[in-house]
Amino acid sequence: MKLVEMLKSELPEYSIKIPSIDNDLLFRPFLVKEEKTLLLVSEEGNMTDILRTVKNILESCFTDLDLSSITLAEAEYLFLKLREKSVGEKLELMYKDTGSSMPYPITVELNKVKVPKRTKKLNDSISITEKINITLSDITLNDVIKENVQIYNPTQDDIIKILSIMIKTINVGEETLTGSDISIKEKIDFIENMTEKQLEKILTFYTNAPSLDHKFTHTINDEEKEFELKGLNDFFGLVSLT
């Protein structure tokens, strides 16, 4: 047996549970070469490239993981749990205080990050008019990469694009159009021609979607400060106060 094959055969295996999947997911730690690739991409700062690398690592480390069947937030959570088992429970981030030129290191305990869940149960079927009904689904990591959409700190245009991606079907009378049958541009035009009240129905589903959200406190110069991390992007750089 070759040395590399021997190493791989001795890798530990872990299990984890998320809401979208009934069975436990099995995974191995990521390897040095995989971490190196992620670090190199992270230094360049392009979030789409970072997420594409995260996707590749997740698919390599997890057994039978279908990223199109779980929410973006769940994929982000799985990556944090993977990092926890691969490197350690503590993650050091930098916080830059107002009026200070030097950032402070702060420690995040990854084992305390909770699995993302929808804030409240909502109907995914929404009536836009008496004749038009749509069904929505939560955005996935695959969606974000495929459509190259800015999911972190989105502009108004980004949010409309995200909403268009979330449209699963459009029912007009007895005719049903699936989201894949309609281009993103057509769905964006569809949303932009809604009234504010119609748009609000879709926004409610979006704003209550599962999200990776972690609140914690850290003492800096004898003062306890409260922080909040939202989305995987916050776990890659500077953090701010809540």
Language-model features, listed with the residues they occupy:
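Long C-terminal interaction/binding lobes of large macromolecular proteins
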Residues: 1-242
